[in-house]
Amino acid sequence: MKKWSDTEVFEMLKRMYARVYGLVQGVGFRKFVQIHAIRLGIKGYAKNLPDGSVEVVAEGYEEALSKLLERIKQGPPAAEVEKVDYSFSEYKGEFEDFETY
């Protein structure tokens, strides 16, 4: 069994920024993202923006973030996700849980 070094574990941790467009406000989208994020051990937030989009900032293991991104692209049944812009960057460790705003 491989023993991971602190550096290797830290390198597996990432930050994801996503901006979700379409019918994503007033349809339970943020709660949907929060539920899946918590199940995947991801911390961060989902926030409604004035232009009708939703901003998601999430931190966790890269594999878990990729799974969350797939859920975001699907959205809950009442949502109509038209486009998701996203990027991955360096883990910052600034969140304690996953919030919605």
Curated annotation (Swiss-Prot):
Temperature dependence: Optimum temperature is 81 degrees Celsius. Thermostable up to 100.8 degrees Celsius. Poorly active at 25 degrees Celsius. Enzymatic activity is increased 4-fold by temperature increase from 25 to 45 degrees Celsius and more than 9-fold at 98 degrees Celsius.
GO molecular function terms noted in the UniProt entry: acylphosphatase activity
Annotated Acylphosphatase-like domain residues: 15-101
Database matches in Pfam families: Acylphosphatase (PF00708)
Positions annotated as active site in the UniProt record: R30, N48
Gene3D superfamilies in UniProt: 3.30.70.100
NCBIfam families: PRK14440.1 (NF011012)
Official protein name in the record: Acylphosphatase
Organism: Saccharolobus solfataricus (strain ATCC 35092 / DSM 1617 / JCM 11322 / P2) (Sulfolobus solfataricus)
